[in-house]
């Protein structure tokens, strides 16, 4: 018996999130169905991040136990990719310590959010980015992003049904102009509340459109009221990029 961790990428467009749902298509269900085909039994899996409906992943980490020690990591990777649907792909499989749970053991999670800035939409990117038809003030957004860094009570930036401890630590928020029409918001933290990254992005865009002043972010953080923050940024622009252990 051994434990392995798979690094997985998926297009979240046609998934009702990562976590198993009784009546909807999810990444976890597709992954565990593939495991059952390979190993002829139900095998539970443990993921680093439970992405929401429409959210993508570049480096999701999923661990599980393998009883057939004769299967190499490459064998497992190839077998999974032969069975998984075309919108899920295993990039790597490696052996890990017994009982490894990436959700509990991740020291850092990194999310990327892409914003497409153009007068006209690019229909081929409609499930990949948030299209905004006007320029953003990136310098103001960078100043505002500093307020999110450090340990804070993120009650104002979570969904109402998330009852977990709202104290979270954000290591870094970067606003990167990849091209004149493509902005990357990179958020690094130990762990996140439900929709927290999308709520952060939505607030930064409010600053970038000059609707809010930079200091508004601090005001909303201190108020601890979700109603004061704007709507979440759309799901399709968000990617679970990687995790560090």
Swiss-Prot record:
One GO MF term attached to the UniProt entry: tRNA pseudouridine(38-40) synthase activity
Keywords: Isomerase, tRNA processing
Active-site residues per Swiss-Prot or TrEMBL entry: 52
Protein EC: 5.4.99.12
Disulfide cross-links: none
CDD domains: PseudoU_synth_EcTruA
Binding annotation for substrate: 111
Keyword match Repressor: no
Reactions catalysed: uridine(38/39/40) in tRNA = pseudouridine(38/39/40) in tRNA
Protein's GO biological process: tRNA pseudouridine synthesis
InterPro entries: PsdUridine_synth_cat_dom_sf (IPR020103), PsdUridine_synth_TruA (IPR001406), PsdUridine_synth_TruA_a/b_dom (IPR020097), PsdUridine_synth_TruA_C (IPR020095), TruA/RsuA/RluB/E/F_N (IPR020094)
Database matches in Pfam families: PseudoU_synth_1
Domain of life: Bacteria
First-tier enzyme category under EC: isomerase
Subunit-structure text: Homodimer.
PANTHER family per UniProt: PSEUDOURIDYLATE SYNTHASE, TRNA PSEUDOURIDINE SYNTHASE-LIKE 1
Function: Formation of pseudouridine at positions 38, 39 and 40 in the anticodon stem and loop of transfer RNAs.
Family designation: Belongs to the tRNA pseudouridine synthase TruA family.
Entry protein name: tRNA pseudouridine synthase A
Organism: Petrotoga mobilis (strain DSM 10674 / SJ95)
């Amino acid at each position: 018996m051994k434990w392995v961790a798979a690094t997985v990428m998926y297009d979240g467009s046609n998934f009702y999130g990562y976590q198993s749902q009784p009546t909807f298509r999810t990444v976890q269900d597709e992954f565990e169905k593939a495991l059952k085909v390979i190993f002829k039994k139900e095998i539970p899996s443990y993921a680093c991040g439970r992405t929401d409906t429409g959210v993508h992943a570049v480096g999701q980490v999923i661990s599980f136990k393998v009883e057939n020690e004769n299967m190499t990591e490459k064998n497992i990777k190839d077998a999974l990719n032969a069975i998984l649907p075309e919108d899920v792909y295993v990039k790597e499989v490696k052996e890990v310590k017994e009982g490894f749970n990436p959700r509990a053991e991740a020291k850092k999670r990194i999310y990327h959010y892409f914003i497409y800035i153009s007068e006209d939409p690019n229909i081929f990117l409609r499930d990949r980015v948030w299209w905004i038809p006007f320029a953003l003030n990136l310098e103001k957004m960078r100043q505002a992003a500093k307020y999110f860094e450090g340990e804070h009570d993120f009650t104002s930036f979570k969904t109402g049904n998330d009852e977990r401890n709202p104290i979270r630590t954000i290591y870094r928020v970067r606003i990167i102009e990849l091209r004149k029409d493509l902005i990357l918001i990179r958020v690094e933290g130990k762990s996140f509340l439900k929709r927290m990254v999308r709520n952060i992005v939505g607030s930064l865009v409010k600053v970038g459109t000059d609707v809010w002043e930079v200091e508004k972010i601090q005001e909303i953080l201190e108020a601890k009221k979700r109603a004061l923050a704007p709507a979440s940024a759309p799901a399709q622009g968000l990617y679970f990029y990687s995790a560090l252990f």
